[in-house]
C-alpha cells in the first residue's frame, strides 16, 4: 500500500513516437469506416469520397489546434486542462466529463460492432455475448501497464493498416486485370445514377455519420502525458496521421465502389466484407472480417486507455473524486479504468435489450458528444492563443489559419447539429445536448459548493 501511495498520482511515460502515431491512426480507422460507411454509401453513393475529404480537412484543423496546445503544455487530461486554464472552471469541468462520456459511448459502439462482426461467422451468437467476452479481455489487458497497451495498440493498428493497403492493392488489381468481371469498373463511380445520385442533399445529410468516422484523432492529445518526447512526437503524429487517414479512407472507398455498384451495399454488413463476398471471394471476405473485428477491438482498446486517462486528469483538477488518482506500482490508473469499465458495461445490457437499434442509437449519441468536444477544443484554442499573444509567447507548433480555421470548424459543428435535427433517429441525440449540459452545470455547482464547505472547515 505504501508503495502504491507513493506512486499514487504519477503516470509513467512509456509511449514512443511509433506508439503515438499508431494510437491516433488506430483510433480513427475503425467502425466508422468499416461499418458506418455502409449507410453513408446508401445515401450519398460515390459522393461519400468527397464527404470524407471535407470531414478529414475539418478534423485536421481540430488536430492542429489541439496539437499546438499540447506541445506547449503536455499534461494528463489533454484539452480539459486547457479549457480549465484558459476559459474557466465550468468549461474545464464540462469538456473533461463530456470527453469521458464520448469515449464511453464510442467504446459501447465498438463493442456492439464486435457482436455484428462475430455474427458474420456465427449468426446464432447474440451481440451482447460477444460484447461481454471482449469487454472482459480488453479491460484485463489495460490493467497491466502503459507499455503493454502501447505495444498491443501498435500491432492492432499495424494489422489494420497493412490490411487496408493490401485491400486497396488487391482491389485495384481485380479492377484493372478484369478478374472481377465486367461489373467491376471505375465507371461505377459516376454511371450508377451519377457521382452524387441523390444530389448534394444526400451527401450533406450524411455528414454527421461521416464525422463519426473521424472521432478518435484527438487521442494524440491524450497520449501527451505519457509520451517520452511530446515536443517532437506530437507534431509528427498530428501531421502524418491525417494524410494516411485520407489515403486509407478515400483510397479504399474509391476502389471498393469501383469493384461493385454502390446500389448493392446493405446497411447491416461491412461494405468491405460484402463487396468481396458478392464477388465470390469468400477467403478475402473472411480475412477482411477478421480485420474489421480487429479494428473494432483496437478502437475499443484505445477507448479504455483514453477514458481512464481523462478521469485521472479530471481528478487531478479536482473535478472528479480523489480516489480516481490511485495509481499502482506500474503507473496504471486502476481506479479510473475500473470506473470507466463499469459504465461501459451498460453496452452489454443495451445489446441484450435492443440488439437491432443499439448501434444506430450509440452512433448518434457519439456524434452529439463529438460536436461538443470539437467545438470546445476550437474555442479553448482561441482563448489559449489570445493568452499566449498577450504574454508575448510564440508557440512552437501553431495551428493552421488561426482564427479563421477555428471559425470554420465552429460553423461546421453548427451545420452538423442542424443536419442531425433533420435526420430521423438522430434528432433525439441533439435534443439531449441541453439536458446533458444542464446535468454538467448542476454537477459543477455541487462540486464548487463542496469545495467551499471543505475550505470553510
Swiss-Prot record:
Keywords: Amino-acid transport, Cell inner membrane, Cell membrane, Membrane, Transmembrane, Transmembrane helix, Transport
Listed GO CC annotations: plasma membrane
Coiled coil: none
Periplasmic side: 42, 108-117, 177-201, 262-271, 355-358, 422-425
GO BP term, example: transmembrane transport
Record's catalysed reaction(s): L-phenylalanine(in) + H(+)(in) = L-phenylalanine(out) + H(+)(out); L-tryptophan(in) + H(+)(in) = L-tryptophan(out) + H(+)(out); L-tyrosine(in) + H(+)(in) = L-tyrosine(out) + H(+)(out)
Alphabetized InterPro entries for the sequence: AA-permease/SLC12A_dom, Amino_acid_permease_CS
Membrane topology: Multi-pass membrane protein
Cytoplasmic side: 1-20, 64-86, 139-155, 223-240, 293-333, 380-400, 447-457
Keyword Cell inner membrane in record: yes
Gene3D superfamilies: Amino acid/polyamine transporter I
Residue ranges of the TM segments: 21-41, 43-63, 87-107, 118-138, 156-176, 202-222, 241-261, 272-292, 334-354, 359-379, 401-421, 426-446
Subcellular locations according to the entry: Cell inner membrane
Similarity field: Belongs to the amino acid-polyamine-organocation (APC) superfamily. Amino acid transporter (AAT) (TC 2.A.3.1) family.
NCBIfam families registered for this protein in UniProt: PRK10238.1
Function: Permease that is involved in the active transport across the cytoplasmic membrane of all three aromatic amino acids, phenylalanine, tyrosine and tryptophan.
Name of the protein described by the UniProt record: Aromatic amino acid transport protein AroP
Native species: Salmonella typhimurium (strain LT2 / SGSC1412 / ATCC 700720)
Encoding gene per record: aroP
Amino acid at each position: 500500500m505504501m508503495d502504491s501511495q507513493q506512486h499514487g498520482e504519477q503516470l509513467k511515460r512509456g509511449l514512443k513516437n511509433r506508439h503515438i502515431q499508431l494510437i491516433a491512426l488506430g483510433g480513427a480507422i475503425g467502425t466508422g469506416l468499416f461499418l458506418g460507411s455502409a449507410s453513408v454509401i446508401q445515401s450519398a453513393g460515390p459522393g461519400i469520397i468527397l464527404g470524407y475529404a471535407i470531414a478529414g480537412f475539418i478534423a485536421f484543423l481540430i488536430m492542429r489546434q489541439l496539437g499546438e496546445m499540447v506541445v506547449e503544455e503536455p499534461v494528463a487530461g489533454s484539452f480539459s486542462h486547457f479549457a480549465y486554464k484558459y476559459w474557466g472552471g465550468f468549461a474545464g469541468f464540462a469538456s473533461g466529463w463530456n470527453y469521458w462520456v464520448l469515449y464511453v459511448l464510442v467504446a459501447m459502439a465498438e463493442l456492439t460492432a464486435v457482436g455484428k462482426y462475430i455474427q458474420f461467422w456465427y449468426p446464432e451468437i447474440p451481440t451482447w455475448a460477444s460484447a461481454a467476452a471482449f469487454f472482459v479481455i480488453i479491460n484485463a489487458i489495460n490493467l497491466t501497464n502503459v507499455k503493454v497497451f502501447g505495444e498491443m495498440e501498435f500491432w492492432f493498428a499495424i494489422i489494420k493498416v497493412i490490411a487496408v493497403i493490401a485491400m486497396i492493392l488487391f482491389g485495384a488489381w481485380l479492377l484493372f486485370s478484369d478478374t472481377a468481371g465486367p461489373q467491376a469498373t471505375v465507371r461505377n463511380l459516376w454511371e450508377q445514377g451519377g457521382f452524387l445520385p441523390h444530389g448534394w442533399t444526400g451527401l450533406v445529410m450524411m455528414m454527421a455519420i461521416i464525422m463519426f468516422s473521424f472521432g478518435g484523432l484527438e487521442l494524440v492529445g491524450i497520449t501527451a502525458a505519457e509520451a517520452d518526447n511530446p515536443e517532437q512526437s506530437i507534431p509528427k503524429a498530428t501531421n502524418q496521421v491525417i494524410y494516411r487517414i485520407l489515403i486509407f479512407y478515400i483510397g479504399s472507398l474509391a476502389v471498393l465502389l469501383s469493384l461493385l455498384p454502390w446500389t448493392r451495399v446493405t446497411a447491416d454488413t461491412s461494405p468491405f466484407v460484402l463487396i468481396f463476398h458478392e464477388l465470390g471471394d469468400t477467403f478475402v471476405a473472411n480475412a477482411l472480417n477478421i480485420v474489421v473485428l480487429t479494428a473494432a477491438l483496437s478502437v475499443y482498446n484505445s477507448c479504455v486507455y483514453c477514458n481512464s486517462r481523462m478521469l485521472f486528469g479530471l481528478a487531478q483538477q479536482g473535478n472528479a473524486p480523489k480516489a480516481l488518482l490511485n495509481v499502482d506500482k506500474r503507473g496504471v490508473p486502476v481506479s479510473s479504468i475500473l470506473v470507466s469499465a463499469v459504465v461501459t458495461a451498460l453496452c452489454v445490457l443495451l445489446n441484450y435489450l435492443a440488439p437491432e437499434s443499439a448501434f444506430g442509437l450509440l452512433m448518434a449519441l457519439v456524434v452529439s458528444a463529438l460536436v461538443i468536444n470539437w467545438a470546445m477544443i476550437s474555442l479553448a484554442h482561441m482563448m489559449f492563443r489570445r493568452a499566449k499573444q498577450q504574454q508575448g509567447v510564440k508557440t512552437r507548433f501553431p495551428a493552421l489559419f488561426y482564427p479563421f480555421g477555428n471559425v470554420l470548424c465552429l460553423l461546421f459543428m453548427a451545420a452538423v447539429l442542424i443536419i442531425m435535427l433533420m435526420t430521423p433517429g438522430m434528432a433525439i441525440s441533439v435534443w439531449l445536448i441541453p439536458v446533458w449540459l444542464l446535468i454538467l452545470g448542476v454537477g459543477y455547482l455541487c462540486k464548487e459548493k463542496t469545495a467551499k464547505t471543505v475550505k470553510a472547515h
